[in-house]
From Swiss-Prot:
Keywords attached to this entry: Chloroplast, Plastid, Ribonucleoprotein, Ribosomal protein
Highest taxon of the lineage: Eukaryota
Quaternary data: Part of the 30S ribosomal subunit.
Pfam family, one: Ribosomal_S15
GO molecular function annotations of the record: structural constituent of ribosome
Cellular compartments per GO CC: chloroplast; ribonucleoprotein complex; ribosome
Protein name: Small ribosomal subunit protein uS15c
Location of the protein in the cell: Plastid, Chloroplast
């Protein structure tokens, strides 16, 4: 998914780029980039730590969105092709 296409899609719905959906989208792009980097550089421990931090941030945002608006959460999960949160 191209960032500009998602921005134009989001601008139709909301004007703010600080929305939860946009933040999750940008974290997902960073995660995919770091994952492909780590496939080549397995011992890059600093990048591994950064990846874990970004995963935690995205997980917290998704948990917030699932509590506040379940419909938007489901749409975002399907749009980005990521798994749902594990519930305890």
């Amino acid at each position: 998914m191209i960032k500009n296409a998602f921005i134009s899609f989001q601008e139709q719905k909301e004007e703010s780029k600080g929305s939860v959906e946009f933040q999750v989208f940008s974290f997902t792009n960073k995660i995919r980039r770091l994952t492909s980097h780590l496939e080549l550089h397995r011992k890059d421990y600093l990048s591994q730590r950064g990846l874990r931090k970004i995963l935690g941030k995205r997980q917290r945002l998704l948990a917030y969105l699932s509590k506040k608006n379940r419909v938007r959460y489901k749409e975002l999960i399907n749009q980005l092709n990521i798994r749902e949160l594990k519930t305890r």
